[in-house]
Amino acid sequence: MHRPEWAMLLDLPTITPILTAIFGSSDYIARGGGGDFCLPGATEYQPLHSDSGDRREFNGVTFGSFRDDRNKLTLRDLPCPYVCCNFLMVDFTAINGPTRQIPATQNSPRELPRRSQEPEWMKLSTVCPAPAGSVLIRDVRAWHGGTPNLSQEVRAIPNAEFLAPWYR
């Protein structure tokens, strides 16, 4: 976020009031930025996933961001701790690899379905149509994934990420 074109995404008059409402305070933290893209000819669905989870160790490597030493809470029990703002650079259409977002899964304790077990409605739960210039504001705990890009254009989505004031 050290470049001016990225830094300007951190305090937009259209986004700041929404983030303040989500976090209940204007003291939220800009975590960073990034994004993703989907190339033309991508024919597979990206597996559903969540961008944040409980802290776990696997083969000596720590993954995840939340840990309750009492083992009473999980990340999904908390209010929204972390938001990603995806900035749509092109129109999202049914054929250019729009993001699919599965409603009401940010607090779900269920395991993510494998691609082969995914119900059809989840594959069709896409954020489209949505015009270029729109912002997809999402709780990173919610299940989401990419879809095939059957168009001839690259679909890029830069993002800015924000943490609740209480979440470190």
Language-model region placement:
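Non-heme Fe(II) oxygenase catalytic core, chiefly the N-lobe of the double-stranded beta-helix
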Residues: 1-132, 145-153, 162-168
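Short, surface-exposed secondary-structure boundary micro-motifs
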Residues: 140-141
